[in-house]
A protein has these predicted regions:
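Glycine-rich, acidic/polar active-site loops that bind/position phosphate-bearing ligands
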Residues: 1-181
Length: 181
């Protein structure tokens, strides 16, 4: 049975809250169900999670607050009202940024320099691995033993022997464009 085809009431909205945990490298998320139509980020509430489970707090004082700062369409839940909410994290006082909330600092600098028309860029790279029967996965497309040819032919390459995982990347690219990212 395909559960994506189950009809839902129009006033139900799923919002996937996404944040960076205390490792500074790992994304975490959880879904909140709103019993109302969400039209903009202003309709989203702050929410909490257990920071001790995400390397951002000690067990006795573990509530970390999620502040939605960017909302886009959810490309994974297309048959219902659904959004992704990228979030900043704050400790219990809802003022002090939690560990690895670097967006707070970047936003502060960008606001102070907004009369300067600042620019910055982000490059997203993906690294795929495949199991090779052992405990240590190898990069996708590498031979079972040894190493591939030097990168020259692969960089901005075309063809089945050079652009491995292209279908995965095209799917990710399309999902991001759909979302508005």
């Amino acid at each position: 049975m395909n559960l994506d085809l189950l009809p839902l009431e129009e006033n139900i909205t799923f919002v996937e809250y996404i944040w960076i945990d205390g490792s500074g490298q790992t994304l975490r998320s959880k879904t909140r169900t709103y019993l109302k139509a969400i039209k903009s980020i202003k309709d989203l509430d702050w929410w909490t999670y257990d920071g001790s489970s995400c390397l951002q707090a000690i067990t006795g004082d573990s509530e970390i607050w999620l502040k939605p700062v960017c909302m886009v369409k959810d490309p994974f839940r297309q048959n219902c009202n659904a959004f992704l909410a990228l979030c900043e994290t704050y400790i219990y006082d809802q003022v002090t940024p939690a560990r690895y909330n670097f967006r707070f600092l970047v936003n502060k600098v960008m606001e102070e320099a907004k009369d300067q028309d600042p620019w910055f860029g982000i490059e997203q790279e993906f690294f795929f691995t495949q199991k090779n029967g052992g405990y240590h996965p190898r990069p996708y497309g590498w031979p079972k033993e040894g190493f591939p040819e030097p990168q020259g032919q692969y960089y901005c390459g075309v063809g089945a022997s050079n652009a491995l995982g292209r279908d995965i990347m095209d799917s990710a690219y399309r999902a991001m464009v759909y979302s508005g990212l």
